[in-house]
């Protein structure tokens, strides 16, 4: 299926591919939502204001909120709410860490400024030197860390060995326990264990986009073991598309993370039930509001789903959305509040190239304002 051309630069909205006014598009979107069995507010690639508006719209329609990177976000969140975790900030890790344990791959893709903002120690007063060891538990022996040319000690096992198995063996050796046969060389395993145990302040870094739930759980257990004799913490890299910011906004507005539904009149969280892919594939959701103001490509939803796209004007779809409203990019076209991986919290971002483009919040508020009128219309 060929990609449909994005709407023209001069068009702010369209209905079934035909240019429309913003009011017409908002009214058409409201009609689709009011007739939906279970609206799905998905993507959620937005700033904090856009996220709040999306949650409000889900509450107004009895819909479901779901971020495009929910699976990875929840893999990092689950250990926190089940057993508790040790966490640090990028700034503290950069200043204090004398041992940095990198785990798995995809790290510089998850945080392009990883080298600059974490792995490179900050400038210190003359005569003050803090030695830092960077060790990498790599997925394979020939792995390389993109955009990093500093000293790094790579530890990798043979082909076909899972990272979870390596972590289990490493955790056992840190505790001084015997292990059975492993593809991880014993000498290398014990060397890595001694490096971690010898840390004065260590930090484990990974991205949940590349690790499974068991591997993340194992990492937190390893860090707990290390804290019996030294200081060690974790720095999970945040998901793209303001994933950590959306997670925070969902928490303070609903008490739950994403994958939360409002059909019962109050927020209900269910990671399986409210998985966007499952909802669309099963037909439980027949109308999707796809929100993406940060450049992420849309999924190829099946044609039976009514799609309301709130995205950048250049976004391309496999099939033209029923309703499309163009919005600007947060921090570029308009001021925004978003999660910053550099500081590990929400920050205000001034628009770098202010324009008259709508924000996600403004677009969703227009739709929400039309919902009462849509519900009052005769069938």
Name each region found by the language model.
Residues 1-30:
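An N-terminal, well-structured beta->alpha segment
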Residues 77-231, 257-379:
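Non-catalytic alpha/beta scaffold blocks inside enzyme catalytic domains
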Residues 30-33, 91:
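Short secondary-structure boundary/capping segments within folded domains
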Residues 19-22, 28, 35-53, 105-109, ...:
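Gly/Ser/Thr-rich loops at beta-strand to alpha-helix junctions
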């Amino acid at each position: 299926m060929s990609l449909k051309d994005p709407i023209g630069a001069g068009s702010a909205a369209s209905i079934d591919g035909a240019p429309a006014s913003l009011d017409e598009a908002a009214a058409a979107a409201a009609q689709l939502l009011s007739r939906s069995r279970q609206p799905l507010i998905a993507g959620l690639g937005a700033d904090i204001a856009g996220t709040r508006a999306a949650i409000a719209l889900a509450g107004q329609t009895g819909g479901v909120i779901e971020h495009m990177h929910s699976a990875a976000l929840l893999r990092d969140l689950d250990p926190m709410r089940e057993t508790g975790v040790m966490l640090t900030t990028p700034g503290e890790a950069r200043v204090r860490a004398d041992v940095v344990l990198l785990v798995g791959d995809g790290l510089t893709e998850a945080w392009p400024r990883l080298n600059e903002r974490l792995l490179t120690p900050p400038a210190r007063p003359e005569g003050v030197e803090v030695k830092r060891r960077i060790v990498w538990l790599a997925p394979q022996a020939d792995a390389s860390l993109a955009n990093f040319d500093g000293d790094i000690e790579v530890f990798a096992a043979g082909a076909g060995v899972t990272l979870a198995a390596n972590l289990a063996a490493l955790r056992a050796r840190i505790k001084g326990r015997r292990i059975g046969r492993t593809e991880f060389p014993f000498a290398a395993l014990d060397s890595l264990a001694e490096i971690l145990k010898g840390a004065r302040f260590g930090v484990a870094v990974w991205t949940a986009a590349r690790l499974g739930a068991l591997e993340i759980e194992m990492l937190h257990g390893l860090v707990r073991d290390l804290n019996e004799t030294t200081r060690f913490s974790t720095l999970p890299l945040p998901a793209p598309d303001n994933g950590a910011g959306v997670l925070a906004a969902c928490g303070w507005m609903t008490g739950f993370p994403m994958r939360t539904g409002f059909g019962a009149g109050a927020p209900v969280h269910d990671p399986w039930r409210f998985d966007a892919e499952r909802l669309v594939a099963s037909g439980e959701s027949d109308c999707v509001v796809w929100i993406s103001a940060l450049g992420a490509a849309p999924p190829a939803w099946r044609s039976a789903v009514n799609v309301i796209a709130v995205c950048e004007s250049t976004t391309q779809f496999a099939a033209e959305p029923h309703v499309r409203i163009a919005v600007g990019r947060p921090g570029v076209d308009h001021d925004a509040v978003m999660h910053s991986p550099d500081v590990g919290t929400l920050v205000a971002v001034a628009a770098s190239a202010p324009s008259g483009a709508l924000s996600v919040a403004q677009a969703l508020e227009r739709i929400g304002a039309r919902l009462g009128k849509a519900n009052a219309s005769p069938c």
